[in-house]
Amino acid sequence: MAVAPTSYDILMGTFRSPYLYTLTFDVLARKLQVREVNEATGGHNWLDVSPDGNTLYATVWGEPPKLTSYDIVRGGEYATTKLSRNVASQYMSGYVCSNNKAMYSACGPQVDTFLVDDNGTLLDQPAVQSFNLLQGQEKNKANGTLDFGGLRHGGHSADLSPDGTKLYVADIGRNCVWMYHVDRETGLLTEASKNIATRPHDGPRHAWPHPNGRIVYSLQEHSSYVDAFRLTDDNKLEFLEGGCIIPDEKDHDKYWADEVRLSPMADVVFGSTRGLEEGTPGFVTAWNLRPDGTFASTEATHRFQTKTSGGWANAIAVCPNLGPNGEVFMTLTDSEVGFIQILAYTSDKGFEVVDELKISTEKEHIMPATTVWL
């Protein structure tokens, strides 16, 4: 059983502020603190760490659209970041992931492939592949104004299968999850299938694979469901079952789901949702899983009501190892007020807030977005 170290470095981006935060979480003291505020090229709403752990990739919310790679500098008391390269993007990206050949970007109207060098740095060149996700008259709207609106109504995420041979792209606007085959020698993609969501109003936002490679969890932004799909023939996804993040009595139209992630042992799946307006708290929900990745029950094992709506965030990122008492640690970011929490979860006791840090100041409203654990 994997056991957490005594402390972790965590990197955190924001939606609008040019800062990258280095945080440390002391597992035994159960304490989270800011160690460094690194200079950033803009607001980084999504972060990804290269497979070797030496490069940070980031989306940039700003004009002109671009993507960024940073060197992760280690050797001191805590990790810091150093800019390695900016590259232009046709549209503002919402999500990136990487292997040792390429970085993949979901940016609303399309999915892009950017190549990286042997050190993981983005090459100083445009995307080598772009897959248009728009259909019919939608293509006429695909111009420079499709920034945040494009992300809200288009391709929103990109994640690789555990063996690195497939890329899953959740597309809110097309109500589907696209599958691409990955050439591991070159990093290039080939479109494989378009997998329509179960409900006409689902709006897939993120698609996260189980370590066994056969199950993919699709987070539905509009309906607040976490759905399990099975990879059927290496080309298509088949719906199995789903659980709702919010309680039955809540109005789905007042929420927009944000994130889906697994516990370190892949025996629990977590989903989070935000309130559409201030005064509507969001939820983080957990379901126990069978060893094959299917739901033990689609009824929630535990729910946690968040302190605020979460703003644009209420994003969870799970610690890669269990805590000393078998607990699952995760970060929860809030952009409404501007704080980050560490949550601990066990299937027996549910969720608890371990620590909280206010990031916003009286002089500046800072909007925490997402984190990565190092």
UniProtKB/Swiss-Prot annotation:
Group of enzyme by EC: isomerase
One MF term in the entry's GO annotations: 6-phosphogluconolactonase activity
GO biological process: beta-ketoadipate pathway
EC number: 5.5.1.1
InterPro entries reported for this sequence: Cycloisomerase_2, Lactonase_7-beta_prop, WD40/YVTN_repeat-like_dom_sf
Gene3D superfamilies in the cross-refs: YVTN repeat-like/Quinoprotein amine dehydrogenase
Pathway recorded for this protein: Aromatic compound metabolism; beta-ketoadipate pathway; 5-oxo-4,5-dihydro-2-furylacetate from catechol: step 2/3
Transmembrane annotation, as ranges: none
Keywords from the UniProt entry: Isomerase
Region forming the signal peptide: none
Catalyses which reaction(s): (S)-muconolactone = cis,cis-muconate + H(+)
Similarity section: Belongs to the cycloisomerase 2 family.
Function: Catalyzes a syn cycloisomerization.
PANTHER family documented for this protein: 6-PHOSPHOGLUCONOLACTONASE-RELATED, CYCLASE, PUTATIVE (AFU_ORTHOLOGUE AFUA_6G11580)-RELATED
Complex formation: Homotetramer.
Name of the protein in its database record: Muconate cycloisomerase 1
Organism of origin: Cutaneotrichosporon cutaneum
